[in-house]
Regions:
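Acidic, metal-coordinating catalytic cores used for nucleic-acid/nucleotide bond scission
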Residues: 116-126, 146
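A glycine- and Lys/Arg-enriched "phosphate-lid" helix/loop adjacent to the NTP-binding pocket
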Residues: 133-179
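Short glycine-/polar-rich loops that comprise or flank the Walker A/P-loop
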Residues: 21-23, 111, 135-140
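P-loop (Walker A) phosphate-binding loop of NTP-binding proteins
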Residues: 4-5
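Conserved glycine(s) of the Walker
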Residues: 8-9
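Conserved substrate/cofactor phosphate-moiety recognition/catalytic segment
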Residues: 17-109
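Hydrophobic positions on the alpha1 helix immediately C-terminal to the Walker A/P-loop
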Residues: 12-13
Length: 180
């Protein structure tokens, strides 16, 4: 897991490591950009199998999307030939986040090595580390940060409150327990 504030350099760190160590790499920002460019996400490229019912229900049943007011939009998704298709108004960061969560869950089930980026804004990330540890994974958490928030690469995203993180949402003790 590469964790840290937006713009701290998590994606840059990836470029310095061999792909063989990373396994399947999941970055919600890259996922969102790919969806916006093509209108779909190719699920097969992540080495997982799913059904139309399974993947679509991950979105229509997402409490996160429901809380954000995207329940109806989630019902507009379609899945065919391993591709999840998005309408133009749906390919946003919330949907990319749900898709990354879905893929992570599938990778855990088949015990495939994977790496992902996160801002660690939700206790569910600690639960994910605990679940992975119980499944026999060896967890590695790399926290990437800068000395000065003024030099972060993408401060405008935080300013727009797309990924605002509340203070003390996760404690270092919670993270430590999940990684040891």
């Amino acid at each position: 897991m590469f964790a840290g504030p937006n713009g701290s350099g998590k994606s840059v760190l990836k470029s310095y490591l061999p792909e063989s160590l990373l396994g399947v790499y999941l970055n919600p920002d890259e996922m969102e950009a790919g969806i916006k460019k093509s209108g779909y996400a190719d699920i097969h490229r992540f080495g997982i199998q799913t059904t139309q019912e399974e993947i679509l229900s991950a979105f229509t049943g997402s409490k996160f999307l429901q809380e954000k007011g995207f329940f109806d939009a989630a019902r507009s998704l379609s899945f065919e030939d391993g591709r999840l298709f998005f309408t133009s108004d749906v390919g946003n960061s919330y949907f990319a986040s749900v898709l990354v969560d879905f893929i992570r869950g599938k990778l855990l089930k088949v015990r495939q090595t994977f790496t992902f980026e996160t801002v660690m804004s939700h206790p569910g990330k600690v639960a994910l580390l605990q679940q992975a540890q119980q499944a026999g994974y060896r967890n590695y958490l790399y926290y990437v940060a800068t000395d000065d928030p003024e030099i972060c690469g993408k401060p405008s995203r935080v300013e727009r409150a797309r990924c605002a993180i509340r203070k003390n949402h996760l404690t270092l003790l919670q993270i430590s327990r999940a990684t040891h």
